[in-house]
Amino acid sequence: MNRGKALQLVKPHLTEHRYQHTIGVMETAIDLAKLYGADQQKAELAAIFHDYAKFRDKNEMRTLIREKLSQQDILFYGDELLHAPCGAYYVREEVGIEDEDVLQAIRFHTTGRPNMSLLEKIIFLADYIEPNRQFPGVEKVRTQAKTDLNGAIISSLVNTITFLLKKNQPIYPDTLATYNQLLLEQK
């Protein structure tokens, strides 16, 4: 699927702000794919569709997870996480993308997971550092991403985990497991 067609398919599902975010994620993912030797076309496609289900009805997504998806535990960790596994499902069913690499990158872009593929890492990080994102610590992660993909992911996870702890929010187990795995690999 070419870029124009993909963007045309995703745009009706997003607000203008989220569409601009998606463009930023796409451009960042392509840059990271070039830098780290990942498949640029897959990175582009996964980035374009990563938030495909972002604005779906929450009850509809909860029902989908309960009835058809394996990530049942995600239901206990906040509505912000639902769109990733549901997005992978909807992209397969509604858009017809069957490339499991692309679908996995969409599925885990919010939480991460241990043993992420290179493509999954790129989409996870591109979503965090795309140019429209402005929050404390993002510039450091952007700089780090140019030379150390895993280190940048660790930094993004530290920021996310710290943010959730300060808000007294639960942390999805795969997020902690991703942090632990990447940190232990660096030692």
UniProtKB/Swiss-Prot annotation:
Assigned keywords, A-Z: Hydrolase, Iron, Metal-binding, Nucleotide-binding
PROSITE patterns per the UniProt record, alphabetical: HD (PS51831)
UniProt: ADP binding residues: 21, 51-54, 83, 109-110, 127, 133, 170-175
Domain HD intervals: 18-132
EC number from the UniProt entry: 3.6.1.41
Source organism, top-level taxon: Bacteria
Cross-referenced NCBIfam families: bis(5'-nucleosyl)-tetraphosphatase (symmetrical) YqeK
Name this polypeptide is given: Bis(5'-nucleosyl)-tetraphosphatase, symmetrical
Source organism (scientific name): Halalkalibacterium halodurans (strain ATCC BAA-125 / DSM 18197 / FERM 7344 / JCM 9153 / C-125)
Source lineage: Bacteria, Bacillati, Bacillota, Bacilli, Bacillales
